[in-house]
Amino acid sequence: MRDKIKNKEYFESIITQKKENISFYLNALKNNRVAIDRKYVVLNSMAGDCLTSLIAKYSAGYPIEDLYTDYYDALEYMHQSWMVLDNRAYLKDTKYNHYFGSDYDLMLWMLSLGYLLDVEKQKYMLLLEILDRFSVKDLLYETIIKAKISERLPITEESYKMIMDMPWAYESLRHAVKETDDEYGKERSSALIEQFLNKEFYQRHKGFSFYDHHHKSNNNIYYGYWSFESAAIADILFVDISPFENNKYFPKDMYFYKK
């Protein structure tokens, strides 16, 4: 067990539930029981179920090797749905070239997990196709992508507008990637990642995404609180992780997996 909030039985029930959901949806799609205008919404739900299953397995203590199938399935369903659905943030009639809330987190986790698991480059490129199709340019996204896809051209500016707590929820982590690439910059980056984990990762998600899910377990929506983006950024920046290695949100086993 890696999670300290719920027990193994709880997570196994989540994993079983998600497996049954995906099987049901696949059967419905195969037998044309999903309306055309609902197909991509269903695929989007399947992507979320696969990612939830992956994180629940990590929380339950599964070997990292057992997470790849869920990742690749989530990636495929996400690509099929997000290339059609427009999940960008909007207010009234205005669309913004960035994501908000759960959609922002989902993309960030998929990018981070793909880096940490060192998934196939060709498969990872599917995430870039989504971002580029909708002109989404984000500092954290691109920092992780560049570490995985070296030929990726750097962005000159980000595409978002400061609305709906993005990128405020990731403020210290964003500052960490802007530090200078020297001994002192790495020390500051390490301190900023520690601050993010201690004071921002969970607290600044209040009101949206995964916040407080462990108190809503009757709905089986809690799957663990893990900052995969912190592990990816810490590895990319080559910082000392000892100050936050045992933080409850830091996925230590995932960080060390490919070391």
PLM region descriptions:
Residues 182-259:
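Alpha-helical oligomerization segments
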